[in-house]
Amino acid sequence: VQTRAHDRSDFVTRWPALLARIATAAEAGAKLIVVPEGTVPAYVIGSDPVDPQQIEAAAADVIAVAARTGATIVYGRARAAERGLANSAYVVTPSGIAGYADKCFLWHFDRRWFSAGDALEPVDTPAGRLGVFICADGRIPTIASTLVEKGAEVLVVPTAWVSSGRDPRALENLQADLMIAVRARENGVPLVAANKAGVEARSVAYCGKSQILAADGSVVALAGQDEETTLTGTVAIGPPLVRLGAEPPPVQRLAGDPLPAVLRVAIAAHADPALRASALVADAELVLDPHERPSSSDVALVDDEAMLDPRALVAPRLDGVRLFVWRCSIDAAWAVPFARTRAAELRAYVVAFDTPQRRAFAVDPDGVVICGTFGAFELAAFTFERARTETWRVAPATDVRDALVRVGKITSRAVAP
């Protein structure tokens, strides 16, 4: 259910209509209904205390709908926790509240009124075993993979994907536009994400784009950016299409001196001495091709198995790798999404050599493809900037390195025997 954003002050008047949308979806036969993050009472909480009676009254309404219709409903709400409020997603079945998930990776102003979650556990429901995570948790690859490792059959994402509004006609969000499909495909399970549309508190713009994805990452249903709507779709529930090993596949870290602060790098899709000679045209100080192994401890070589495993690049990146070189032979439609996702979630450069397509391309730490070869254009170049790999902050007070380390501790507990 993609809802129209509301201010906290408007919750009481908006809630009957929101509840009616949930009930209508359930009465139409939906077995699993997902409602956005921060629906009750809102995402932008502010400094005023939350009324627990208001929160519990809304919960009772949702419980009644689930009991009457037989649906499983996942919705975003504030939860009173030991350390203050938690940004939670509650899972409600016909039998009542089955469980909840707290947001682990707080984003930007979340920290002002929420405390971070510290557990990752699937929730059993009549609709399947659900791996629930919230919004920015989707930027940390090991959150979804831990839930699937613990038996989740569907990934469920109540979210509040925001946009800067750079182009009001095409609102952007890296998760909605890129990462969330990779999360489904790399874990091999369906994924359902519900976002808001519109503006909250005159200062938070949502990009819509709620979506239902199949286990291979393909789109079953996708909402637009502006409308309040209910998406419907059918996905297959069963064992994951992907089976991750007990341990992440190895990544080959190279030896040598660190890369300089600024380095011009040329990339070629195939080894050719003549192309290497042409590197002078690009002012390149380093030329990479599928067989070149640069002598630097900042660089690691990655094969398909490691690139597709959401866990494999995390430890090397935390240990100081800044440039991943990938010899790629996967489906061409997924090469760029995986390279972009890994670069953005780990704040690193990725150079990919797509052997079947005879193409090389590079991605920067923001997940942007910054150069690539094609056709007769056989040598492309980019500038490696070490400082960009040292900046882990992706929003105010939102540090990816801190989150990776913190979630690593949570996942270690979660998978411990």
Describe the residue ranges of each PLM region.
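Short beta-strand segments enriched in small/hydrophobic residues
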Residues: 1-5, 256-272
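Residue-level recognition of beta-strand->loop/alpha-helix junctions
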Residues: 2-4, 36, 102, 195, ...
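Active-site beta-loop-alpha junctions enriched in small/polar residues
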Residues: 3-6, 78-80, 103-104, 135, ...
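Cys-nucleophile CN-hydrolase/nitrilase-fold catalytic domain and related Cys-dependent amidase chemistry
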Residues: 8-97, 161-189, 266, 270-301, ...
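Short beta->alpha transition motifs characteristic of CBS
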Residues: 41, 47, 90, 101-107, ...
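CN hydrolase (nitrilase-like) catalytic-core segments centered on the catalytic cysteine
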Residues: 55-74, 139-228, 286, 309-378
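Active-site catalytic loop in hydrolytic enzyme cores
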Residues: 80-154, 158-159, 163-178, 236-256, ...
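C-terminal beta-strand edge segments of enzyme domains
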Residues: 113-114, 122, 183, 190-263, ...
